[in-house]
UniProtKB/Swiss-Prot annotation:
One of its GO terms (biological process) is protein unfolding. PANTHER family: ATP-DEPENDENT CLP PROTEASE ATP-BINDING SUBUNIT CLPX-LIKE, MITOCHONDRIAL-RELATED (PTHR48102), ATP-DEPENDENT PROTEASE ATPASE SUBUNIT HSLU (PTHR48102:SF3). It comes from Baumannia cicadellinicola subsp. Homalodisca coagulata. It is found in: Cytoplasm. This is ATP-dependent protease ATPase subunit HslU. Its main location: cytoplasm. Gene3D superfamilies: 1.10.8.60, DNA helicase RuvA subunit, C-terminal domain, P-loop containing nucleotide triphosphate hydrolases. GO terms for molecular function: ATP binding; ATP hydrolysis activity; peptidase activity; proteasome-activating activity.
Length: 446
């Protein structure tokens, strides 16, 4: 679980997302409150429930990106789902309970990797011994008798000599034949939508029936060492303890990000039941409020899982959500539409910004690209103008604009090896102004 303070979380998010300070503060406080709750005594801890968040803002302003970056910072079980993928219980489609099952699967994987990392040193020692056993086979009992008679320490000294060479990497390219656990042959079972849990259980059963077999493989020592370390680390892991820790991590620190929640709002002009909108909202209620979900790893309580929902709400409004669900999303944060200045910052400020990506890509062909300040300003203004005149898709417009701008350079890059190209305002105008001025053309191309 992350021990970062709210200001540290916001600073980390600032490296990747421009603006949206209120949304960053809200998720930072929510993440820190997870840690604060765990510091309380057990009696009070059970009374403190997470305050779920609803992020409202137009598409392309950073809602999903905040979720992606938060997942890396949280160091806790995290899953992002699309609200539109679910249907009401009893109808064809995924049920909302699968959110918790997928979250638990993610937690088990996370805890297993952490446990394997803790046991890495012991796993490396075991892997080293297995490789040495192949290079210098251990003497049989009969051979030991002969060695003792000769009063020789040759086997141990030879083994130590090879161990030193192995650790120094001198044997990396040598090929050996080694026995590794064979990957069980998976049985593909096509099941109706909504029955994924049964399918997983059947596949696990068939894998267990196959048993653990070993397969002899020939490979270089460097590659064999990696595979053996993974295999030995997996042997040192206690699967039952992993499941227990994973379920506890989900129940106490789990975070669920539900994107596109506005798409399951029922608008006033629509009549009749809708199994993929209001029905899904009703099914989400017990999860958000707190219930127990059965997973293949055990029963999981959702009382203390943090839910963050987001939506553009361009057609619907938050008030179109059913009242019970509105009440379970008490913290509302509105994200602002992007300005031309924001577009400029998006092009230059974040780590691995779009301009940096194109510079690095063209450098692989030996072409040096530079973006001037007035060129970046013109790109930002163009993106903002197209958003205003057609459909506002936020920062995603920059991908389209830059791809068109760089099309000629990308196509002829191999012929321009060693050249330097400066992308200034004049270059941008000559390549984009005609497209922008033709509204019909820009609507379909940009």
């Amino acid at each position: 679980m992350s021990h970062m303070t709210p200001s540290e979380i916001v600073n980390e998010l600032d490296d990747y997302i421009i603006g949206q300070h209120n949304a960053k503060r809200a998720v930072a406080i929510a993440l820190r409150n997870r840690w604060r709750r765990m510091q309380l005594d057990e009696t009070l801890r059970h009374e403190v429930t997470p305050k779920n968040i609803l992020m409202i803002g137009p598409t392309g302003v950073g809602k999903t990106e905040i979720a992606r970056r938060l997942a890396k910072l949280a160091n806790a079980p995290f899953i992002k789902v699309e609200a539109t993928k679910f249907t009401e219980v009893g109808y064809v489609g995924k049920e909302v309970d699968s959110i918790i099952r997928d979250l638990t699967d993610a937690a088990v994987k996370m805890v297993r990797l952490q446990s394997m990392e803790k046991n890495r040193f012991r796993a490396e020692e075991r892997a080293e011994e297995r490789i040495l056993d192949v290079l210098i086979p251990q003497p049989t009992p009969n051979n030991w008798d002969k060695i003792e008679e000769n009063n020789s320490s040759e086997p141990s000294s030879t083994r130590q000599h090879f161990r030193k060479k192995l650790r120094e990497g001198q044997l990396n390219e040598k090929e050996i034949e080694i026995n590794l656990a064979a990957t069980p042959i998976g049985v593909e079972i096509m099941a109706p939508p909504g029955m994924e849990e049964m399918t997983n259980q059947l596949q696990s059963m068939f894998k267990n029936l196959a048993g653990q077999k070993q397969k002899s493989r020939k490979m270089k020592i460097k590659e064999a060492m990696k595979l053996l370390i993974e295999e030995e680390a997996a042997k040192l892991v206690n699967q039952e303890k992993i499941k227990e820790k994973a379920i506890e991590a989900v129940e106490q620190n789990g975070i669920v990000f539900i994107d596109e929640i506005d798409k399951i709002c029922k608008r006033g002009d629509v009549s009749g039941p809708d199994v993929s909108s209001e029905g899904v909202q009703r099914d989400l209620l017990p999860l958000v409020e707190g219930c127990t979900v059965s997973t293949k790893h055990g029963m999981v309580k959702t009382d203390y899982i943090l839910f963050i929902a987001s939506g553009a709400f361009q057609v619907a409004s938050p008030s179109d959500l059913i009242p019970e669900l509105q009440g379970r999303l008490p913290i509302r944060v509105e994200l602002e539409a992007l300005t031309p200045k924001d577009f400029q910052l998006i092009l230059t400020e974040p780590n691995a910004s779009l301009t940096m990506q194109y510079i690095a890509l063209m450098a692989t062909e030996g072409v040096s690209i530079s973006f001037t300040e007035d060129g970046i300003k013109r790109i930002a203004e163009t993106a903002w103008q197209v958003n205003e005149r057609t459909e506002n898709i936020g920062a995603r417009r920059l991908h389209t604009i830059l791809e068109l701008l760089m099309e000629d350079i990308s196509y002829d890059a191999s012929e321009w090896h060693g050249k330097t190209i400066s992308i200034d305002a004049d270059y941008v105008r000559s390549h984009l102004d005609d497209l922008v001025s033709d509204e019909d053309f820009s609507r379909f191309i940009l």
